[in-house]
Amino acid sequence: MTLDELANELCAVSDEKAVRDLAKYIEEWKGDDRNAEVLENMVERFFGNVWISKEAEHSKAYRLWSSFRDDAIHGIGGMTMNERLYAFGLFERFDSCKSEAERLEVYGKVHAKP
């Protein structure tokens, strides 16, 4: 599952504002300078502090997140740069970088070295 698929799947699980806000936060992460570890911490904090009213929806949303987290974030060390860009939906951003500094920011987001 990619980050984009995760955001879409979360919206399909529940129509609660909190879940839509989480999906939006996940999408916005792609455009800022925070790395995958920060993403993990923020989403885990969300699930620890925000309750989705229906237990089944909460459980499914957390299972989706856990699957992505375990595969993409915890497995990031075994991925090539292209696999990281794909998993985190960052191909377009990486390809549109106009400077080395912008590229280094993307490398940092996915814990990669140029």
Task: Identify the function of each model-found stretch.
Residues 1-114:
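C-terminal-biased regions
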